[in-house]
Amino acid sequence: MIIKNITNLLQVTSMRDFFAYIYNSRKINRVELLRLLKWQNYGLVVRLKAGFKETDIEHFARCLNLNDDEIEIFIKVS
């Protein structure tokens, strides 16, 4: 699957890769964080929202184990 963002194209093969990218990148554009990304391979809808205070890397790990048809994951980038 491809994540299209403002600065580049990122190819990811799993949600774990995606979260690692988000966690490791400190240059993510705030406009990009408000985009709605559709994950065809997982049946998930991931809404990126800057500054959601209750999320952290442990929350990301818990989300990887969810099997819902559609979930919203709110990601904080510090």
Q: Where would I find each of the regions flagged by the language model?
A:
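The DNA-recognition helices of helix-turn-helix-type DNA-binding domains
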Residues: Q40, G51-F52, S78
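Short amphipathic recognition helices of helix-turn-helix/homeodomain-type DNA-binding modules
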Residues: I71-S78
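DNA major-groove recognition helix of helix-turn-helix/homeodomain DNA-binding modules
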Residues: E54-I71
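Short alpha-helical DNA-recognition segment
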Residues: R26-V46
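Flexible coil/turn residues that form the inter-helical turn or adjacent wing/linker of helix-turn-helix
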Residues: R26, A50-K53
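DNA major-groove recognition helix of helix-turn-helix
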Residues: L48-K49, D56, I75
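A short, Lys/Arg-rich alpha-helix, primarily the initiator
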Residues: M1-E32
